[in-house]
């Protein structure tokens, strides 16, 4: 991510939420320059919110620990961030080594994501002002919390005359 953002003269801050990890996530993240926040309750919404509320930038990218984005994704994201009309977005999901029937399910999700502008939880970006206006992800949900967040983000986008983008090919 650094190259795409630094090329534009932007500062990059990495905030990692340690949500009771047992694999030294916090120590590894700190050793690599990230700021680590801790969330005691094991819930993805709370972990995302802890990191999101700690972030100091104008934009927030939520990236799941098991996601492996390419540099092109960050470049495409940065291009969208430069546009005043962009409120947020995400990317279609790609997974390797899946059986055909699972690939069909993923294809269906990606279609729904593109049509309804619903970024998958594995990679969501949005303006920090929108995240704070929404008060983050709902603590009431233990699954599909990103869909509920996306729906509220879309409402703000419509109200502001902005857009949610789903990147197809980074």
Functional labels for PLM-detected ranges:
Residues 18-26, 67:
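A conserved acidic beta->alpha catalytic loop
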Residues 60:
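Short aromatic/hydrophobic "clamp" motif used to bind/position activated sugar donors
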Residues 88-97, 109-126:
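A recurrent flexible, glycine/aromatic-enriched loop bordering the glycosyltransferase active site
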């Amino acid at each position: 991510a650094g190259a795409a953002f630094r090329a534009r003269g932007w500062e990059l801050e990495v905030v990692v939420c340690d949500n009771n990890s047992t694999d030294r996530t916090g120590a590894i993240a700190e050793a690599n320059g990230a700021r680590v926040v801790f969330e005691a309750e094991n819930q993805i919404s709370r972990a995302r919110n802890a990191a999101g509320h700690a972030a100091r930038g104008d934009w927030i990218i939520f990236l799941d620990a098991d996601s492996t984005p390419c540099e092109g994704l960050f470049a495409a994201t940065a291009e969208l961030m430069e546009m005043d009309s962009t409120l947020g977005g995400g990317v279609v999901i790609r997974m390797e080594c899946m059986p055909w029937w699972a690939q069909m399910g993923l294809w269906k999700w990606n279609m729904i994501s593109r049509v309804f502008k619903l970024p998958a939880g594995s990679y969501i970006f949005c303006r920090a002002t929108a995240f704070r206006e929404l008060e983050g992800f709902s603590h009431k949900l233990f699954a599909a919390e990103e869909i509920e967040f996306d729906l509220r983000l879309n409402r703000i986008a419509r109200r502001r005359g902005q857009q949610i983008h789903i990147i197809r090919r980074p």
